[in-house]
A protein has these predicted regions:
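Amphipathic, Lys/Arg-enriched alpha-helical "gate/interface" segment within cytosolic domains
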Residues: 1-136
């Protein structure tokens, strides 16, 4: 599993890009490191790029993770676009999107254009290829 991210503080935006097999343990470790970043409270928009990723945990673990995410999400005044093209990630993202806490705040997208429109940001494919993303 590979995750890299970049903060765009002028836009109150965090972009994270996941590749390979996403495990519950790997996702939890990433979240723990992310929570320690002092820039996180300034973020109001999240773009998660998961086009090249696959969820490698059970449905029960997916539900468990959503519950953990709800408990650790102190600020629900965010907008989160999840850009995906794989069935496993789409199913996982759907559990988040359908939860009452995240209703109207999370959108599953199949194109970057849809995601940027939902978040009201200007990001291009070339921005996602930048070498200054931090690898986790």
């Amino acid at each position: 599993m590979g995750i890299k991210n970049k903060f765009f503080l002028n836009d109150s935006l965090l972009i994270d890009i996941s590749t390979g097999d996403i495990t519950l343990q790997g996702l939890g470790e990433y979240q723990e490191k992310l929570k320690m970043d002092e820039r996180l409270p300034k973020i109001r928009k999240i773009l998660s790029i998961t086009r090249d990723a696959n969820v490698k945990f059970s449905l029960k673990e997916m539900f468990l993770y959503v519950e953990i995410l709800k408990k650790t999400t102190s600020d629900t005044n965010i907008r989160w676009a999840i850009l995906t093209s794989t069935p496993s990630v789409t199913a996982f993202a759907s559990l988040i999107e359908l939860d009452k806490l995240f209703q109207n705040k999370v959108l599953i997208c199949s194109t970057l254009e849809t995601a940027t429109r939902f978040l009201q940001i200007q990001i291009t494919e070339s921005d996602l290829q930048s070498s200054d993303f931090k690898q986790f």
